[in-house]
């Protein structure tokens, strides 16, 4: 059923968002030393607003995050932020760039199993040097036949990747934690997607899945369940996994189909 299986990296293969949360906490303490007291919600709102506004100019990643923190510090202090505090933000960014890569449980075994049967692709957004460095340090690079580091994940970007590698969209599967980046644009481009929600995620990556997209995406509790799902999808139609109906008392429908039998 699939010719290529692609994976997101950050918060799909390895932990990432908690590094940014730790960075925001360090930044909150920095602002407090500068005389600006913000609670967690206000800090999150300010930093996220600045980050999202800057995506168009600086893209995603630690460098963009650090620039957004510096801009937030200037605004929050009315331009009175000290040079030493700006330097502390730079140190924070350097620490984030050098952090040890911690894989999610089941990732090495899942990639080893799938790479023996399918060409695997990594499609990750962010800073090229940092993403390449993380992939090398993760020990996962040998599993991937293709690596794509992009600035944004849109239907057009995915269409370009598929065209460049001669991949039929209907035989392409993308696996990731972000509905906005890994699921919806792939489905719109004609592919299939698996949503593996992460315990921690950036609010900007949340999105609603329209009804027409639900039957081309699946939701799994962990990446370790992926080989079983792919085996079931590749089996004859009678053996394919059934979708779990939405719970009657659930305030929110599942974003994608949740297989109940693999």
Question: How would you label these PLM feature ranges?
Answer:
Residues 1-2, 84, 108, 112, ...:
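Asp-based, Mg2+/Mn2+-dependent phosphohydrolase catalytic module
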Residues 1-7, 12-45:
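Active-site neighborhood of HAD-like aspartate-dependent phosphohydrolases
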Residues 23-31, 47-51, 89-94, 131, ...:
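Hydrophobic alpha-helical core bundles mediating ligand binding, dimerization, or RNAP-core interactions
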Residues 33-38, 78-80, 139-142, 166:
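Short helix-capping segments at alpha-helix termini
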Residues 37, 46-95:
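A metal-dependent, Asp-based hydrolase signature
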Residues 117-118, 190:
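Glycine-centered short loops/turns at secondary-structure junctions
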Residues 124:
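Conserved phosphate-coupling serine/threonine residues in phosphotransfer and NTP-handling enzymes
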């Amino acid at each position: 059923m699939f010719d290529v299986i692609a994976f997101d990296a950050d918060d799909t293969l390895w932990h990432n968002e908690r590094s940014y949360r730790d960075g925001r906490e360090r930044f909150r303490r920095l602002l407090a030393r500068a005389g600006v007291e913000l609670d967690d919600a206000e800090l999150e709102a300010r930093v996220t607003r600045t980050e999202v506004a800057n995506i168009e100019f600086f893209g995603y990643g630690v460098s963009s995050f650090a620039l957004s923190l510096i801009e937030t510090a200037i605004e929050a202090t009315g331009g009175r932020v000290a040079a030493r505090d700006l330097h502390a933000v730079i140190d924070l960014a350097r620490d984030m760039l050098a952090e040890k890569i911690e894989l999610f449980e089941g990732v090495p075994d899942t990639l080893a199993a799938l790479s023996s049967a399918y060409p695997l692709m990594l499609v990750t957004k962010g800073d090229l040097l940092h993403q390449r460095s993380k992939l090398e340090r993760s020990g996962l690079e040998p599993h991937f036949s293709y690596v794509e580091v992009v600035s944004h994940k849109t239907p057009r970007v995915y269409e370009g990747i598929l065209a460049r590698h001669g991949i039929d969209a209907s035989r392409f599967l993308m696996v990731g934690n972000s509905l906005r980046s890994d699921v919806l644009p792939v489905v719109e481009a004609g592919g299939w997607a698996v949503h593996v929600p992460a315990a921690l995620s950036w609010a900007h990556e949340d999105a609603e899945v329209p009804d027409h997209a639900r039957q081309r995406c699946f939701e799994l509790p962990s990446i370790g369940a992926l080989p079983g799902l792919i085996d079931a999808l590749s089996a004859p139609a009678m053996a394919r996994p059934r979708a779990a109906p939405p719970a009657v008392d659930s305030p929110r429908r599942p974003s994608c189909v949740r297989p109940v039998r693999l």
